[in-house]
Amino acid sequence: MAVPTNSCLLVCLLTLTVLQLPTLDSAAPFDVTAPQEPVLALVGSDAELTCGFSPNASSEYMELLWFRQTRSTAVLLYRDGQEQEGQQMTEYRGRATLATAGLLDGRATLLIRDVRVSDQGEYRCLFKDNDDFEEAAVYLKVAAVGSDPQISMTVQENGEMELECTSSGWYPEPQVQWRTGNREMLPSTSESKKHNEEGLFTVAVSMMIRDSSIKNMSCCIQNILLGQGKEVEISLPAPFVPRLTPWIVAVAIILLALGFLTIGSIFFTWKLYKERSSLRKKEFGSKERLLEELRCKKTVLHEVDVTLDPDTAHPHLFLYEDSKSVRLEDSRQILPDRPERFDSWPCVLGRETFTSGRHYWEVEVGDRTDWAIGVCRENVVKKGFDPMTPDNGFWAVELYGNGYWALTPLRTSLRLAGPPRRVGVFLDYDAGDISFYNMSNGSLIYTFPSISFSGPLRPFFCLWSCGKKPLTICSTANGPEKVTVIANVQDDIPLSPLGEGCTSGDKDTLHSKLIPFSPSQAAP
């Protein structure tokens, strides 16, 4: 019976050996390992996650996949010797990359830049060689130390003090403690910990101080994961609640009121004296500056007797007084459609053209609350609503509503010392200078940046609303004459002489909405 038994044992051993051969052959020819301890990274820093490949050989041409929960959520895919950005999750594009140098030594290091709270969790690296693959897991922990704590104090009517400690930018949720100067911990009365869209926590912790013997309190906020924290200390004021009789309180209030009245009277008298002294100095200084300007900065300009050109006037503009006044009406005139006539903006040009020299004229605006005055190139576009800016050949200032503006590309707001009733236009063609003055007080309204003119320039006028008194060009009394003005005059220096060629305008209020003006807005 022994021989059959030994034969049976031999057959069983051979069978087991044969069954194990396919299993051994099917095992992957490499292993993938990863550190067991989590990798810790601070918010905003860079994190490196590494897994190893053994036997220690080059894995440069193998397929490598770093992923989170499933293989379809690729943090990084390395295939055919390069990273496949098209397969990468959106939140990791531009932040996750592979240290390719380690692949030659059998290491795969994933570099995540600008770490966020949402990056925390498990990452798996998978190596694939043909049909063989192995994977390992690495865990990333994220932490952040927040801002320095701030303590605010509120004293209650009963003498108790409420302290509130606030700080932001922590992760994970921090631990907050109140401590006395003797390092004794006290409980909080309320505590709030909220996280923002980035996942970082903001804490606000309050407590009440009822023990008057406590001199100092500190707020300590700790990140348990990092073993780091921040602390701030505040000194508490000594309690002082004096017992006062009613008559002492009344006397104190009366004395305090008398003291305030005395101080106020002294301060008011001193301020009034300083203001009067300043005004006297300013008046004296203005006279001195005027004399100096008269001696050093006189510019002689030729006063022009400007008249309006009816061939350029918009059909709603009516000219009066030998083409020296213009008014905007609701009715539309039947006029020849000339190339030089404005058909959209309610504008008109002067007859005079300037190609050189220095020129000057005045316009009476009176109490009108809407107008535009200046110069323009003779060949400006007069059809349609092209913007009236220097780029399009217009240099003008305007009043619309309660605002004064220079018609620059972005419309420059002007701050004037007072509303001008008469505006002087100063043109120095050769110097490329256009300036506007308030002839009522001699102050400068606006000067356009210097420009090199080319081609003829003409006076330019525009009105925005109907039914008001005309805009009037001031006439020279006895023909063209020389007028002396101050160059770059200050706001508080009067300009002289002003001329007497016009009367004041009307006092109507603005009611029209003709910006932009279109012929379709008024019936003929």
From Swiss-Prot:
Signal peptide positions on this chain: 1-26
InterPro entries xref list: B30.2/SPRY (IPR001870), B30.2/SPRY_sf (IPR043136), BTN3A2-like_Ig-C (IPR053896), Butyrophylin_SPRY (IPR003879), ConA-like_dom_sf (IPR013320), Ig-like_dom (IPR007110), Ig-like_dom_sf (IPR036179), Ig-like_fold (IPR013783)
The keyword Disulfide bond is assigned to this record: yes
Cellular compartments annotated: Membrane
Known role: May function in the secretion of milk-fat droplets. May act as a specific membrane-associated receptor for the association of cytoplasmic droplets with the apical plasma membrane. Inhibits the proliferation of CD4 and CD8 T-cells activated by anti-CD3 antibodies, T-cell metabolism and IL2 and IFNG secretion.
GO CC term (a single one): membrane
Principal location listed in the UniProt entry: membrane
Quaternary data: Seems to associate with xanthine dehydrogenase/oxidase.
Record topology, Cytoplasmic segments: 269-524
Name used for this protein in its record: Butyrophilin subfamily 1 member A1
Processing after translation: N-glycosylated.
Domain Ig-like V-type: residue ranges: 29-141, 149-235
Tissue and organ expression note: Strongly expressed in lactating mammary tissue (at protein level). About 100-fold lower levels in virgin mammary tissue. Also detected in spleen and thymus at 10-20 times lower levels compared to those detected in virgin mammary gland. Very low levels in several other tissues, including brain, heart, kidney, lymph node, lung and small intestine. In the thymus, detected in the stroma, in epithelial cells (at protein level). Most prominent in medullary areas of the thymus and at the corticomedullary junction (at protein level).
Domain B30.2/SPRY: 286-480
Classification via SMART domains: IG, IGv, PRY, SPRY
A Pfam cross-reference name: SPRY
Species annotation: Mus musculus
The family this protein is said to belong to: Belongs to the immunoglobulin superfamily. BTN/MOG family.
